[in-house]
Amino acid sequence: MPIYLAEKTKNLIDQKIEEDQGSKYREWLGKVIPTISDAFDPRNGRRSHLGVSTIGDPCARKLFFQFRWVARPKHHGRIIRLFNRGHMEEGRFIAMLLTAGFKVWQQDAEGNQFRISELGGHFGSAIDGIVVGCPDMPDPNQAILTEMKTHGDKSFKKLLKDGMKVSKPMHYAQVQVYMRKMGLAACLYIAVNKNDDEIYCELIPLDAAVADQFIDRGCKVVMAEEPPVGLSTKGASWFECKMCDFSDNCYRNEPPLVSCRTCSYSRVVEDGTWKCINPVVNRTITTDEQIAACSHYEMANYYGR
């Protein structure tokens, strides 16, 4: 399986930063970092949609539970800092590309962040950006997707050895869906080793069949009327199950958190809304109402079995 290293891009970034010893790079950082709103957002709201970044996860049951708010893990402070670092690193990636002479877009003409969605937004995500000027493309003027990721040392070394598709299949699924929905033929995947700041650049071509497979998977998970079969068939001792946020729900009959999404009366609607079919309510329910639930809550009968 070919790996299309974007060596010209990597070398150009290093060359341009070195030319003035990082002056222009730091200037861009000062402009870009304040725009990375996710890094400074104080809210801890629940994600109302199934994110594209998770669609390559091997366990469809886990995806169903995420979308249905079955559990809400409380992360250790170190993990929260790790998540935030990923957001902050996005600003550094963008500053690198701008320093190297790339054109970078993250918003449309109305100032809205580029997003892709299916089923009225039930399945979707914002993309990292679109770039023009990649010297590794046959036509550098062609607009392509860019996806930016941070890696620990072990993960980064595997990436160097095997390429993104093999070493990070969830990243591969994510960018395939993005490219397909955005009508882009390639993705510039940029990664950084958090240990020593080494960067890795690879071009990922669109595989429409793979993209369609994962889009279909996302839609099926969203519209599923009960939890799909997942890795839980392997048993509680399976390593991915032991680390899963929903292990207690799968193996130890832990009831789900109370919300409309775990209620027997709730229904997903293809237009991006949720509906309560309880005869007393019988209407569309807002996200705030879903979080709060109501006095008619009745746990869906597929939990605990």
Question: What is each stretch, according to the model?
Answer:
Residues 1-145, 152-154, 165, 295:
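Metal-dependent nuclease catalytic cores that hydrolyze phosphodiester bonds in DNA/RNA
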Residues 7, 18-19, 27, 89-90, ...:
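Glutamate identity and glutamate-enriched acidic tracts
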Residues 142-148, 185-189:
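Conserved active-site beta-strand-loop modules that form the wall/rim of enzyme catalytic pockets
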Residues 148-152, 193-194:
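A short mid-domain helix/strand-loop element embedded in enzyme catalytic domains
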Residues 154-160:
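Active-site-adjacent loop/helix micro-motif of nuclease/hydrolase catalytic cores
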Residues 158, 165-172, 177, 181-280, ...:
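Metal-dependent nuclease catalytic regions and adjoining charged, substrate-binding loops involved
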